[in-house]
């Protein structure tokens, strides 16, 4: 017997398809929607439709945007000689909110994760190499071994060489590639793979520092975080 509205149950079911939303939370959301003014509900519905119809990916950096190229890639005020590589568009947003970075970006679309069946060909890794050197061709990618990690978490992947055998300097004018991937095994594997892939090119490959958060206490930090903080220590200004 149906004790509640079929429309409400359908909405609850749709809400449960969202990440981290369980049945109880979905039902609370559905009940909240019932109490919302009609115009607010229509605004949400229109926003959901617009996201699927109007949003696209920048053909240069692959960030989610309303235009192509995106405002960052299309701006002459950004430093195109520096590319910050991130996993997802949300990571780009986080970095932009610091107002400290003036370069451009490259969104990978994830990280290399052999356990999840995600390899380099599933990401926009080779598109990054092409941005640095337009003559780069990914002819050896299929023959390259899949990235793996050793028991201690170190990546032992070997990146496929570029067909041009290396470039004396990046033809696109890129001087530095900053790897802003998460500090975990998958992030380490991805960073290692990219660093090896870009080795033939005359570009500096760096990775964002890892260490203690501002306001954090040493006694609560784990050993790995403390080790990274010590390794990345700098001069006191």
Swiss-Prot record:
It holds the Pfam family Toprim_4. SUPFAM superfamilies: Recombination protein RecR (SSF111304). Residues 81-213 form the Toprim domain. Residues 132-171 are annotated as: Disordered. InterPro entries: DNA_Rcmb_RecR (IPR000093), Rcmb_RecR (IPR023627), Rcmb_RecR_Znf (IPR015967), TOPRIM_dom (IPR006171), TOPRIM_RecR (IPR034137). Keywords: DNA damage, DNA recombination, DNA repair, Metal-binding, Zinc, Zinc-finger. The keyword Aminoacyl-tRNA synthetase does not apply. A zinc finger (C4-type) spans 58-73. One of its GO terms (molecular function) is DNA binding. PANTHER family: RECOMBINATION PROTEIN RECR (PTHR30446:SF0). May play a role in DNA repair. It seems to be involved in an RecBC-independent recombinational process of DNA repair. It may act with RecF and RecO. This is Recombination protein RecR. It comes from Salinibacter ruber (strain DSM 13855 / M31). The lineage of its organism: Bacteria, Pseudomonadati, Rhodothermota, Rhodothermia, Rhodothermales.
